[in-house]
């Protein structure tokens, strides 16, 4: 290798050193100085891992003074190069720049520059880069992008709502599904889609204080969304880091009380430029025209500043038309400004609902009914569709579905309100109650008497709360070490039940963490029963481990002992037996407990066991829940309303459980109230709204499509290849689970999403649902997305060289595989990837410019190739550099046609889809006032910006592979 003082070379193994200069040459060694780092390297002359840097006409080079030059001619004299060309800053031509004065901070970013500079990648990295481009482009085009990555069952009605709302600009909707139908999951799916597509970047979730951790866990575990929980302490800390503390995080959860309590805090929240606001338990926002509550006013103020708003409530509108109106008013105050007018409008929807029922029944329609449908829909060319719907042809059913869809678009609050009911959603189990009446021990009787005397001044509510938990009253007098479990008959019953049902998984819920911990110790020490504990004092990781141990079929825990707060947000539908060691204070909490098992997808009827002590508040409550509300064996949408109306009476009975006079009458009255309200709910069910919210066959097809994608073997192969190349260790643990741990030779020292201790992953949705300690890997998981970013945002795999052993071709035949990327730059919120994601175009050129890519498929070709070490590769590249340059020019001439075709197709698709959506909403605006002006404006603006961005789309060479034919 001939070296001359002043020549510029680059290290093949340490490219980060920049451009080196030969400063010393002797018989056996050569010394290079790398000015950008100030370091020297001594190499053997005969076989040094360095590559001569030589630029060609057409290249742009930078001088050590910072100015740039377009090379037009290269001269060599005594082994040193001089570049002649035109300066780009002054446009002076004929400028000469000797190679010694080249900028030393040279970075080769173009694939061809890296190849010619000897920066040759491993062949498997090139293949990974191409696959990453290909799969990434395909995923963006999927119609349900953003709906596949969550750790949830594929439930059609949830997917339907999320798919509809998640694609809207700044959605403002009310999610009002009945308890247990998954409003939190629907909201999470909508957030996930909006964040993934770039439609939203900053999200604020406001919930009651007791639900903060539930939301935190749900968002992280199900959607891989890492929210920050803001309380007084966190807010005070963040004030040191920013003028507005909420600017320090993109995704924030806080309580309603936290937001409402301080005027300055509320102002900071309003100024923080959120894209989406989510409010859970919105039925607690009390409103009347004369006196809205402070909570309502706080949310109203926020809703005025935040473009997208999701309100969640389980309270049906029939149980309070005024509060229902108040919630809709938060979403669109211009549309919902007059309560009296709103009530009148609601009455007018009855004929529409009847028309939908008529169409769905499938009976022949009379002329009057056809005329009424025509008037309701109000389209000029509706006649053929009406005739088709009333015919006996094969198209009749689809015509009726289309008419139903048109009716739902044009009438009612279906764009702002979604409500599914258990009657409309199939797949729920039965619930069977087993009450076990037990005697009240004398120890408790004594403690309760003394407590009654000492707590005479306590309020009835405090006394009632105390009476629900006699073991705690006993401990107050006997101290924390009091062994109440030695005489409490509920403990004996529980041990007997568990030992006689060893094969069953049993969920035991009690109000307090201390009770759960004490029960675990007793079960373990007395009967050797394996019990996991789950309470609010544990970290999320500890809870995951406990849940995973409970989920294990053979070696797992038989029992999971949960505290009230600790179990929030967790579902264990693989179990069907529940024991309530005590009872919660209100019907909402009771439903929440049962909801841990009573989910869609539960395979067995739920057995609810309630051991209770006679003559205690528990005996009062168990009767009231069961006989007064039927709340154990059926969901109870009337529970909160009745609870509020009889609260004072109920509290008195709970505080003095031995005084039962009039209690039977109270139960009878509550049951009558319950039946009347239930009938009112059933009669007032908005069938139109339920049909729209449910999604029908369309939602079912969506769930099936995603289920098919779950079996994508390309993902597993790609992920394993990705982990190998990044340097992540993989340990197969069986049961479709793999443990990933960082290695000492990773591409990056700290890979996002991979902790030092490692993580457990699975590609199987069912395993992920059963094992909360295993992360569910899909194309949308941060681990895969971070891996794609790592590969595609850098140079990994962008230049390589391979040998093709093929005796049918002459030795030395050259082929160049080019991967171009066609792309457009635009702000993320335009969601340009729907139409033109960065799309790879593969070309396989011979020296005459013939493109063989169509005949030679990538994976088949890749398997026929052999790798070349970097040193040999550099020699090969130097030998054929001129030929490669010529082939590259032929490639540049050919790519334009393919790229233009892709760009034109994207423009046509964008124009067609966005114009159609705009036209549809403009037509509906005439008959349905629930379509907001700002939504129409946003779609028109979005269309214009998308078209402008696509007009400026271009292409670039992303990767290349040089292939040399050999016979050896």
Curated annotation (Swiss-Prot):
CDD domains: DEXDc_RapA, SF2_C_SNF. Keywords: Activator, ATP-binding, DNA-binding, Helicase, Hydrolase, Nucleotide-binding, Transcription, Transcription regulation. The keyword Cytoplasm does not apply. It holds the Pfam family Tudor_RapA. Residues 490-662 form the Helicase C-terminal domain. Its EC number is 3.6.4.-. Residues 164-334 form the Helicase ATP-binding domain. It comes from the Bacteria. ATP binds at residues 177-184. GO terms for molecular function: ATP binding; DNA binding; helicase activity; hydrolase activity, acting on acid anhydrides. A motif (DEAH box) lies at residues 280-283. The keyword Transcription applies. PROSITE patterns: HELICASE_ATP_BIND_1, HELICASE_CTER. GO terms for biological process: regulation of DNA-templated transcription. Interacts with the RNAP. Has a higher affinity for the core RNAP than for the holoenzyme. Its ATPase activity is stimulated by binding to RNAP. Transcription regulator that activates transcription by stimulating RNA polymerase (RNAP) recycling in case of stress conditions such as supercoiled DNA or high salt concentrations. Probably acts by releasing the RNAP, when it is trapped or immobilized on tightly supercoiled DNA. Does not activate transcription on linear DNA. Probably not involved in DNA repair. Belongs to the SNF2/RAD54 helicase family. RapA subfamily. This is RNA polymerase-associated protein RapA. It comes from Shigella flexneri. The lineage of its organism: Bacteria, Pseudomonadati, Pseudomonadota, Gammaproteobacteria, Enterobacterales.
């Amino acid at each position: 290798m001939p070296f001359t003082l002043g020549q510029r070379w680059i290290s093949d193994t340490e490219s980060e050193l920049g451009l080196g200069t030969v400063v010393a040459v002797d018989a056996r060694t050569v010394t290079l100085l790398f000015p950008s780092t100030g370091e020297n390297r001594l190499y053997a002359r005969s076989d040094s891992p360095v590559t001569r840097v030589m630029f060609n006409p057409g290249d742009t080079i930078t001088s050590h003074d910072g100015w740039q030059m377009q090379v037009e001619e290269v001269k060599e004299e005594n082994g040193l190069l001089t570049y002649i060309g035109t300066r780009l800053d002054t446009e002076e031509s004929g400028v000469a720049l000797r190679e010694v004065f080249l900028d030393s901070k040279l970075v080769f970013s173009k694939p061809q520059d890296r190849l010619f500079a000897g920066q040759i990648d491993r062949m498997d990295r090139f293949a990974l880069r191409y696959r990453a481009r290909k799969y990434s482009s395909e995923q963006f085009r999927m119609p349900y992008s953003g709906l596949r990555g969550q750790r949830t069952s594929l439930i059609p009605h949830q997917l339907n709502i999320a798919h509809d709302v998640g694609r809207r600009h700044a959605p403002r909707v009310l999610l009002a599904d009945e308890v247990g139908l998954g409003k939190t999951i629907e909201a999470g799916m909508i957030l996930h889609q909006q964040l993934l597509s770039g439609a939203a970047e900053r999200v604020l979730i406001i919930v009651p204080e007791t639900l903060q951790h539930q939301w935190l866990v749900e968002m992280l575990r199900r959607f891989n969304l890492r929210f920050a929980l803001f309380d007084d302490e966190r807010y005070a800390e963040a004030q040191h880091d920013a003028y507005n503390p909420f600017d320090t995080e993109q995704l924030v959860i806080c309580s309603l009380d936290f937001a409402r309590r301080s005027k300055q805090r509320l102002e900071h929240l309003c100024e923080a430029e959120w894209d989406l606001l989510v409010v859970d338990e919105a039925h607690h926002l009390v409103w009347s025209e004369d006196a809205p509550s402070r909570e309502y006013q706080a949310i109203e103020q926020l809703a005025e500043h935040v473009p997208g708003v999701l309100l969640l409530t389980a309270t049906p509108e029939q149980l309070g038309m005024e509060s229902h109106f108040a919630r809709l008013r938060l979403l669109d105050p211009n549309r919902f400004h007059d309560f009296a007018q709103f009530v009148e409008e609601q009455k007018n929807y009855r004929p529409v609902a009847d028309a939908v029922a008529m169409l769905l029944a499938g009976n022949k329609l009379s002329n009057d009914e056809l005329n009424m449908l025509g008037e309701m829909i109000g389209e000029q060319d509706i006649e053929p569709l009406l005739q088709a719907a009333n015919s006996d042809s094969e198209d009749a059913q689809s015509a009726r579905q289309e008419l139903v869809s048109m009716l739902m678009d044009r009438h009612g609050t279906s764009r702002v309100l979604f409500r599914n009911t258990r009657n409309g959603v199939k797949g729920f189990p039965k619930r069977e109650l087993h009450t076990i009446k037990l005697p009240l021990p004398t120890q408790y009787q004594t403690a309760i008497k003394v407590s009654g005397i000492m707590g005479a001044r306590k309020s009835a509510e405090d006394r009632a709360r105390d009476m629900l938990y006699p073991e705690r009253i006993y401990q107050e007098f006997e101290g924390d070490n009091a062994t109440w479990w030695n005489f409490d008959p509920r403990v004996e019953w529980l041990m007997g039940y568990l030992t006689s049902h060893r094969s069953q998984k049993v969920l035991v819920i009690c109000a307090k963490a201390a009770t759960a911990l004490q029960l675990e110790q007793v079960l373990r020490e007395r009967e050797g029963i394996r019990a996991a504990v789950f309470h609010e004092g544990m970290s999320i990781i500890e809870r995951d481990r406990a849940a995973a141990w409970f989920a294990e079929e053979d070696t797992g825990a038989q029992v999971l002992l949960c505290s009230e707060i600790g179990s929030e947000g967790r579902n264990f539908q693989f179990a069907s037996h529940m024991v309530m060691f005590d009872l919660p204070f209100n019907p909402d909490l009771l439903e929440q407990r049962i909801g841990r098992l009573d989910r869609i997808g539960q395979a067995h009827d739920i057995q609810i066991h309630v051991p209770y002590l006679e003559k205690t508040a528990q005996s009062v409550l168990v009767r009231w829940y069961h006989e007064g509300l039927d709340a154990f064996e059926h969901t109870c949408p009337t529970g909160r309303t009745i609870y509020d109306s009889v609260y004072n009476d109920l509290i008195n009975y709970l505080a003095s459980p031995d005084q039962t006079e009039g209690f039977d009458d109270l139960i009878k009255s509550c049951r009558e109230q319950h039946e009347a309200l239930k009938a009112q709910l059933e009669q007032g069910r908005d069938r139109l709204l339920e049909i729209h919210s449910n999604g029908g066959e369309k939602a079912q097809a969506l769930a099936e499509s995603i289920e098919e994608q779950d079996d994508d073997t390309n993902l597993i192969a790609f992920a394993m290849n990705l982990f190998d190349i990044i340097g992540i260790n993989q340990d197969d643990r069986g049961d479709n689970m793999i443990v990933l741990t960082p290695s000492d030779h990773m591409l990056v020292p700290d890979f996002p999403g991979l902790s030092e201790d490692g993580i457990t992953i699975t590609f199987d949705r069912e395993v992920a649902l059963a094992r909360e300690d295993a992360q569910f890997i899909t194309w949308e998981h941060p681990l895969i997305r971070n891996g794609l970013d790592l590969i595609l945002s850098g140079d990994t795999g962008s230049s390589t060289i391979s040998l093709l052993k093929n005796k049918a071709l002459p030795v030395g035949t050259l082929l160049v595989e080019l991967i171009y990327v066609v792309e457009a730059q635009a702000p993320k919120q335009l969601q340009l990837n729907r139409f033109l994601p960065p799309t790879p175009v593969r070309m396989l050129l011979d020296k005459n410019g013939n493109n063989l890519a169509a005949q030679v498929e990538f994976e088949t070709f890749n398997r026929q190739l052999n790798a070349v070490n970097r040193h040999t590769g550099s020699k090969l590249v130097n030998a054929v550099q001129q030929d490669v340059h010529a082939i590259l020019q032929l490639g540049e001439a050919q790519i334009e046609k393919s790229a233009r075709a892709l760009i034109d197709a994207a423009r046509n698709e964008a124009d067609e889809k966005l114009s159609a959506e705009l036209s549809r909403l403009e037509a509906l605006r005439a008959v349905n006032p629930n379509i907001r002006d700002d939504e129409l404006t946003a779609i028109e603006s979005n269309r214009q910006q998308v078209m402008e961005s696509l007009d400026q789309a271009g292409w670039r060479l992303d990767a290349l592979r040089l292939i040399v034919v050999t016979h050896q």
